[in-house]
């Protein structure tokens, strides 16, 4: 039995319904194929800016209405923008689901985009940019993508720049929405308890307009660029990202990559955590993650470390990566599988997590992989696949290294990359 019902309108809009009669609430969201990967230099940050502006009022609701209605229903009406999509979501009691969705739908399809509101919001977004720039870990992550994908839009910052934000006009926002907020690149998802007929009727009211554009445009493959990039900044702790090219969202190898990330840095028993923190006390936090996008993928190790411990921490991390392909065991792989699948099963007890998985999967891949199929793919990853893929992460000469802070400097990192002691 499918995990959700899918209804596709003639114009390409997709509605996903996953009913749970035992629930007392409904989690819902609208996903749109608008993100920083679809922006030019002149429109950098426009997807995120639109996300802000829809909360400033719509055809039926003022900004005060939006806030008070959401508060009255007890839900958290929120949104986020990523590299490949924008999402508007909430969770409310089942009886309030139609009203909550009508609120989101009107915001998304009929935002006011008032010029005065836009000028005020420019200041808000510029403050948000300043906040992220003041956080070394966030700054390092953004800079990593910029230098790892310098010729591709995957490297663009979701927030944009102060110059691009300050140049935005209502007409620019409307043109972007006309292009990317088309029915064919929009997905709505409901998980929990709701009145099916009312939801379908509301979707027809708000999302049945003729499609004026095609679905999400295809992006070219993103070329990954290894190298060393040092950004000097006065910080109490240096931030390091060591990243490699990894499987994209359309590749089944991404499941092996997720398990490698778990074994190396995804838990308290992972190799990097044990070696750098528990055995040597070099870091408080070290992480390994696998991120897959439509045009590329990234496997990255990130850490925050003092300058005094930086060299030893980086050399130790390099050693762990180098040793891993030849020393990883079946026992470690079994542990990683169990850790991954246990987390998945527990997360899917949340209707909000299910809605996010279904909506994102439908928008980007044309369908979310089922829990059963995902378990089969995770269980099906062999030790040979792990070893083969891990070898592409074993040499820092293949890595893009981004370091922010009062770091050990380019000379040290270039020596590490070259393999010299």
PLM features: what roles do these ranges have?
Residues 3, 8, 19, 63-214, ...:
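Charge-rich, well-structured scaffold segments of protease-associated domains
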Residues 5, 13, 24-28, 227, ...:
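A generic secondary-structure signal marking the coil-to-beta-strand transition
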Residues 12, 19-70, 144, 252-264, ...:
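Active/ligand-binding-proximal structured segments within catalytic/core domains
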Residues 13, 195, 268-269:
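A generic "binding-loop/recognition-motif" signal
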Residues 20, 29-31, 214-271:
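His/Glu-based metal-binding/catalytic segments typifying zinc-dependent metallopeptidases
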Residues 27-29, 87, 241, 300:
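Short hydrophobic beta-strand segments that form the core of ligand-binding sensory/regulatory domains
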Residues 28-34, 48, 104, 218, ...:
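A signal for specific C-terminal beta-sheet/loop modules enriched in small/flexible residues
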Residues 48, 52, 152, 239:
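Histidine-centered active-site/metal-ligand motif
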């Amino acid at each position: 039995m499918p995990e959700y019902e899918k209804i596709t309108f003639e114009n390409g809009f997709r509605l996903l319904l996953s009913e749970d009669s035992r629930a007392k609430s409904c989690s819902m969201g609208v996903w749109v194929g608008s993100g920083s990967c679809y922006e030019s230099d002149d429109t950098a940050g426009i997807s995120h800016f639109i996300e802000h502006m829809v909360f400033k009022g719509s055809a039926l609701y003022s900004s005060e209405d939006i806030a008070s209605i959401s508060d009255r229903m007890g839900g958290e009406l929120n949104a986020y923008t990523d590299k490949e999509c924008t999402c508007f979501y909430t969770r409310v009691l089942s009886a309030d689901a139609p009203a909550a969705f009508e609120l989101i739908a009107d915001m998304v399809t009929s935002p006011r985009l008032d010029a005065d509101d836009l000028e005020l919001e420019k200041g808000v977004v510029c403050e948000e940019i300043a906040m992220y720039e003041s956080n070394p870990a966030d700054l390092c992550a953004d800079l990593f993508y910029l230098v790892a994908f310098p010729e591709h839009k995957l490297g663009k910052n979701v927030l944009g720049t102060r110059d691009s934000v300050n140049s935005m006009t209502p007409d620019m926002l409307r043109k972007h929405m006309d292009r990317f907020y088309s029915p064919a690149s929009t997905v709505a998802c409901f998980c929990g308890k709701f009145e099916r007929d009312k939801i379908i009727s509301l979707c027809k009211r708000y999302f049945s307009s003729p499609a004026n554009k095609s679905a999400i445009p295809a992006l070219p493959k993103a070329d990954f660029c290894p190298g060393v990039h040092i950004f000097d900044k006065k910080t109490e702790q240096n931030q390091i990202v060591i990243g490699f090219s990894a499987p994209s969202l359309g590749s089944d190898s991404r499941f092996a990559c997720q398990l490698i990330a778990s074994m190396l840095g995804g838990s308290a028993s992972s190799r990097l955590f044990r070696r750098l923190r528990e055995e040597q006390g070099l870091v408080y936090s070290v992480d390994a993650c696998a991120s897959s996008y439509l045009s590329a993928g990234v496997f990255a190790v990130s850490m925050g470390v003092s300058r005094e411990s930086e060299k030893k921490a980086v050399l130790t991390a390099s050693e762990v990566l180098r040793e891993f392909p030849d020393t990883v065991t079946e026992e470690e792989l079994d542990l990683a599988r169990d850790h991954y699948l246990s987390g998945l099963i527990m997360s899917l007890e949340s209707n909000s997590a299910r809605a996010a998985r279904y909506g994102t999967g439908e928008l980007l891949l044309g369908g979310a992989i089922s829990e059963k199929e995902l378990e089969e793919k995770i269980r099906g990853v062999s030790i040979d696949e792990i070893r083969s893929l891990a070898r592409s992460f074993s040499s820092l000469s293949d890595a893009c290294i981004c370091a922010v802070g009062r770091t050990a400097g380019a000379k040290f990192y270039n020596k590490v990359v070259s393999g010299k002691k």
